[in-house]
Amino acid sequence: MPADVPLTVEQRILEAATRLTPGGIPCAPSETALLHELRRATSARRAGVAVDMALAAGVVDLARLREAARGRRRLPAVASYAIERACAECRSPKESEMLQVWEGDLRFPRPLMNREVIDLSGRVIAVVDLVEDASGTYGEYKGAAHRSRDRQRRDEARAAALRDVGLEGFVIVAGDSERVWRQRMQSARSRASWLPAGERPWRLGRFVPAPPLAHPDEAVSDAMMLDHYRSLE
């Protein structure tokens, strides 16, 4: 191709493609594929989610992604935003959106995501979706998995344990508008204790990644066993 002819996005992907094993198919590097996908994002929020989820899945490396982005001309603003503020500790799209509202819309400092909360005896109380250690504020997104009676009971016990050690929380559920998100975040942060580090009856532990997905055969076996146990009740 003549040097003075601009490359299309598709041509750049093919140019960057690598070949797998002999006889394999051309395969673009994950970072190149993600950059191409970001050009299709309809909003900065969606672009941010795409990057965070690719990082959570382990299919891209953030340093390589940023290096690849520096070599691209006319990168869309939403793509630049998503790569600049990327977070590898969000375990779901809603967590990524929650983080973006917290630090992007409200301009609060970046919190930690999916961290253990530990009491002074060393017991792990919970792993919370979002937590700001300076203020003692945490946030949770509760989707459909939290609607069962047993799950709601566990959630209430967990929230009580977090209150007992002085953490102030907010909860976001499916259907809430981002205006409601902002109100709850601001309200919880204003109620928080803001205790100095040495006076907190809690501390933060390690980051907890998402558990691996079960093998399909194991999932089928688990479902069969649950049906069997239900039949015995």
Task: Report each predicted region and the residues it spans.
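Surface segments flanking catalytic/ligand-binding clefts of nucleic-acid enzymes
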Residues: 55, 60-233
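Hydrophobic alpha-helical segments and helix pairs
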Residues: 2-63
